[in-house]
Swiss-Prot record:
It comes from Prochlorococcus marinus (strain SARG / CCMP1375 / SS120). Coiled coil: none annotated. GO terms for molecular function: ATP binding; tryptophan-tRNA ligase activity. It is an enzyme of class 6 (ligase). This is Tryptophan--tRNA ligase. Belongs to the class-I aminoacyl-tRNA synthetase family. Its EC number is 6.1.1.2. GO terms for cellular component: cytoplasm. The gene is trpS.
Length: 339
C-alpha cells in the first residue's frame, strides 16, 4: 500500500528553538514512520526580509543538521534544501500568473510584517504565500502539518490548485495538482514566549530571553528559565486563562519530561515557582543534551550531512519535476529539450 505523502519545513532564520521542536519537528519525527515524509529547509522564504548571506548559508546547514539531530531519519524521510530544487521558483512564477492580486493583499501575515518594514517591504514578502503554495503543491502532498497561524496559507494553496489551475486548465478527468489537506497536531501545537504567555515563542522576537534555542548551553537555559515571567499565585495549574505563563511552562515540562498533563498537574498543584523552575530547567537540559551531541557530531564533519542533503535532493528533484511538467503542459508550454 502506497503511503500518503507529508511535506513540511522550517525557515533557516534565527536559532531553532524549543517551540519549533515541541510544536513541529518532534511531531514530524513520529510522522515519518507512517507517511512518505519530505522535510525542507525553506531558504528561499528566508530572503523575503533583509538578511546576511553568510548567515543564511550557516543557518541552512544548521537547520538541516538539527532536523537529523532531533530524530528525522534520512532512511525514512527526504531532507533537502528548497533552493536546490529550481522547480520551486518556476512553479511559483506559473502560479503567480494565475493568482489574483487581492488574494495576496488580504493575507494576515503580510499585513503584519508590512507594517514593520514600511517602505522597505518587498514583492517577495507579498508573494510569500504563493511560493509556499508552490512548495506544497510541487510534491503532491496529501497532508501538510500546520499550526493555526499557517492555516490561511494552506487554504490559499488549496484555492490556487483547485480554482485557478485544475478548474481552468484541466482537460482530462485527472487533476493537474493534488489538493492537500491540513494535518493539525494538537499536542505542543503552540509554545508561548517565556516573557509573555499570550504571545507565541518566535525566532524573530528581539528579546533573546523570550525563547530557548535548541543549542543553548545549560547556563543560558538556567538564566532564561530563571527570568521567565510568572505570577503571584500559589500552586501551578493548566488551563487558567488568568495564568497563561503557568499553562505554558507546565506544558513545556509535560512535553520535555514525557509526562501527561494529569500527572504534571498532580505533581505541581501545591508547589511554588521557586521550586518548579529548577526542576523545569533540569528537564529541558536533559532533553536537549542528546540533540546537541548529535548536532555537533554532524556539523563537525559535514560529509554525512552533505550526503543526506544530496540524497534528499535527488528524490525531491525527481518528484518536483514530474509535477512541474504536468503544470507546464496544462498551461501550454513546450516540453523542455533533452540535454
Amino acid at each position: 500500500m502506497t503511503k500518503k505523502r507529508v511535506l513540511s519545513g522550517v525557515q533557516p532564520t534565527g536559532a531553532i528553538h524549543i517551540g519549533n521542536w515541541l510544536g513541529a519537528i518532534r511531531n514530524w519525527v513520529s510522522l515519518q514512520n507512517e507517511y512518505d515524509t519530505y522535510v525542507c529547509v525553506v531558504d528561499l522564504h528566508a530572503i523575503t526580509v533583509p538578511h546576511d548571506p553568510q548567515q543564511l548559508k550557516e543557518n541552512t546547514l544548521r537547520t538541516a543538521a538539527l532536523y537529523v539531530a532531533c530524530g528525522m531519519d534520512p532512511k525514512k524521510c527526504s531532507i533537502f534544501v528548497q533552493s536546490h530544487i529550481s522547480a520551486h521558483s518556476e512553479l511559483c512564477w506559473l502560479l503567480n500568473c494565475v493568482t489574483p492580486l487581492n488574494w495576496m493583499e488580504r493575507m494576515i501575515q503580510f499585513k503584519e510584517k508590512a507594517i514593520k518594514q514600511g517602505d522597505n517591504v518587498s514583492i517577495g514578502l507579498l508573494d510569500y504565500p504563493v511560493l509556499m503554495a508552490a512548495d506544497i503543491l510541487l510534491y503532491d502532498a496529501d497532508l501538510v502539518p500546520v499550526g493555526e497561524d499557517q492555516k490561511q496559507h494552506l487554504e490559499l494553496a488549496r484555492d490556487i490548485a483547485q480554482q485557478r489551475v485544475n478548474s481552468r486548465f484541466n482537460k482530462e478527468s485527472k487533476s493537474i495538482l493534488k489538493i492537500p489537506k491540513p494535518l493539525i497536531m494538537k499536542e505542543g501545537g503552540k509554545i508561548m514566549s517565556l516573557i509573555d504567555g499570550n504571545m507565541k515563542m518566535s525566532k524573530s522576537d528581539p528579546n533573546e530571553n523570550s525563547r530557548i534555542a535548541l543549542l543553548d548551553s545549560p547556563e543560558i537555559i538556567k538564566k532564561k528559565i530563571k527570568r521567565a515571567k510568572t505570577d503571584s499565585f500559589l500552586g501551578l495549574e493548566f488551563d487558567n486563562n488568568q495564568r497563561p505563563e503557568a499553562n505554558n511552562l507546565l506544558g513545556i515540562y509535560s512535553m520535555v519530561s514525557n509526562q501527561n498533563r494529569e500527572a504534571v498537574q498532580k505533581e505541581f498543584s501545591n508547589i511554588g515557582w521557586g521550586k518548579f523552575k529548577p526542576i523545569l530547567t533540569d528537564a529541558i537540559i536533559e532533553s536537549l543534551n542528546p540533540i546537541q551531541q548529535k548536532y555537533y557530531s554532524l556539523i563537525k564533519d559535514k560529509t554525512e550531512l552533505n550526503n543526506i542533503l544530496n540524497k534528499g535532493y535527488i528524490k525531491a528533484n525527481t518528484i518536483s519535476n514530474q509535477t512541474l511538467k504536468r503544470v507546464r503542459n496544462a498551461l501550454g508550454f513546450l516540453d523542455k529539450p533533452i540535454s
